[in-house]
Structures are given as C-alpha cells and as structure tokens.
C-alpha cells in the first residue's frame, strides 16, 4: 500500500501540472472503487485547480467550489501524460487538463477512492487523524505521552492513524530498526530517550524515502511512470532470511495484526 512518502511523491509530481490549469472534463471508465466515484467528479467541467495538498495518505485537490479527495488504496498510482495514450485495463480515471496534460489514475485492485466534499473539515475520512509525522507537533515528548499507558506492541501502535498518520507497514518496520527497538516491545516500555530517538528516525526515514521517490515493491509508480527507489535502501522490510546489513544476523519475519513485520533479533531490543 502506498504510504506517506509515496503519496507525497505523487503530490509533488502532479502539482506543477495541475495548479493554474483547468480541468476540462473527467473521464471515468470504472467508478466502482472502494467507494463509488462521487457524482460531482463526473460533472467536472472547466474547473481550475487551485492547489494540490496532502493530509495523511490522502491527496487533496482544491477547486473553487470544493475538494477532490484521492486515496491510492492498495495498488493505486497517478501519472501525468502529455498525450491521450490508450487506456489499459486498470486505468480507471482521467482528468483532462487545459494545458494538454492528463492526470491518469491506475488501480489494479480498485481499493482506492475519488471523493468530493464542499468542506474538508469534518469529512469522515479526514476526521480523528493524528498529527503529521513531519510536523513539529510530532516529537519525542508527544510520543512519550501517547505511549505511556499503551499496553500494546509498538509496531502496530505506530501504524494507528490516531497516533500519527502515514507511517504504514514499511516505514514502521524500517524506523524501529533504525531506532534499535524490537517491534514486540510494549509501547509503554519505551524510555524518554527511546521516544526521542524514534520520533527523530521516523522523520529521517520518511524524508529519505521522499527524496528517493518512495518505495516501489509492486504497483506504485511516480507521476512520471518511474518506480520509487527507496526499495533499494530497505534495511529489514521484505528481507526475511537475508543477512542484516549491520550485523549479519538473518532478518526475521512475524505478523502483527495480520501485517508482516521484519526485524533483526540482534540489533533490536
């Protein structure tokens, strides 16, 4: 599933081609996504794009009368096309722009979403979200307070959007490795120093992935059709049985809440 770096990479890639241009029309080939494509999107015509923003794993296209909320789901990606290339099987949505560009949404598993709202505040998919991990609000003290009485393993807790948004399976595993924290540790067992370190490395891992265009394991592509290159730098995720890049111990894979977790028995305590 695309996580924060992949969504932010998409945002940065499409923003220059959309902001200041006008949506001439939307071409919806298959509106049966996780939720049906909103009727308002079908009716878009001569509508300028004012900004392209991101909240958690949602892309937000600001229009004069409302917002398009896009979620990439499990396998979605957005590409900017310079011409109307023939659509393939999983190309479900096109936004045809006044500058000759086309924003094309591809989603093999159709778990994504294209929604419409007049106001962002209070929309059900955006309500009750925790802070952005790259914001000043997310720091060691915040993490310490939230973990203090939490009797659950730290790995699934990091993936809870009420704690912090956008830290999915890949980056939770990678951040815990970078901090030397075992994924089975109770959140409440983390010391002040460990919370400070974990908050810092989460930011560093996410920023590094954004610099590399995100992580492509299967379906994700950047807006120019290229893969994300952070997969080449993964320390533990997807490396079951391979030697730890630090100590040589084979990487272990387990499951937390039906999600794969990867770690090094020697480096993480």
Swiss-Prot record:
Catalytic residues, chain numbering: 2-3, 57, 259
Cofactor: Zn(2+)
InterPro entries cross-referenced by the UniProt entry: DNA_glyclase/AP_lyase_DNA-bd (IPR015886), DNA_glyclase_Znf_dom_DNA_BS (IPR015887), Formamido-pyr_DNA_Glyclase (IPR020629), FPG_cat (IPR012319), MutM-like_N-ter (IPR035937), Ribosomal_uS13-like_H2TH (IPR010979), Znf_DNA_glyclase/AP_lyase (IPR000214), Znf_FPG/IleRS (IPR010663)
Cross-referenced SMART domains: Fapy_DNA_glyco, H2TH
Entry annotated with the keyword Zinc: yes
Name listed for the protein in its UniProt record: Formamidopyrimidine-DNA glycosylase
A single MF term (Gene Ontology): zinc ion binding
EC number: 3.2.2.23, 4.2.99.18
Co-factor remark: Binds 1 zinc ion per subunit.
Chain positions of all zinc fingers (FPG-type): 235-269
Lineage: Bacteria, Pseudomonadati, Pseudomonadota, Gammaproteobacteria, Enterobacterales
CDD domains on file: EcFpg-like_N
GO biological process, one term: base-excision repair
Acyltransferase keyword on record: no
Entry binding sites for DNA: 90, 109, 150
Role: Involved in base excision repair of DNA damaged by oxidation or by mutagenic agents. Acts as a DNA glycosylase that recognizes and removes damaged bases. Has a preference for oxidized purines, such as 7,8-dihydro-8-oxoguanine (8-oxoG). Has AP (apurinic/apyrimidinic) lyase activity and introduces nicks in the DNA strand. Cleaves the DNA backbone by beta-delta elimination to generate a single-strand break at the site of the removed base with both 3'- and 5'-phosphates.
Gene: mutM
Catalytic activity, as annotated: Hydrolysis of DNA containing ring-opened 7-methylguanine residues, releasing 2,6-diamino-4-hydroxy-5-(N-methyl)formamidopyrimidine; 2'-deoxyribonucleotide-(2'-deoxyribose 5'-phosphate)-2'-deoxyribonucleotide-DNA = a 3'-end 2'-deoxyribonucleotide-(2,3-dehydro-2,3-deoxyribose 5'-phosphate)-DNA + a 5'-end 5'-phospho-2'-deoxyribonucleoside-DNA + H(+)
Subunit and interaction comment: Monomer.
Similarity remark: Belongs to the FPG family.
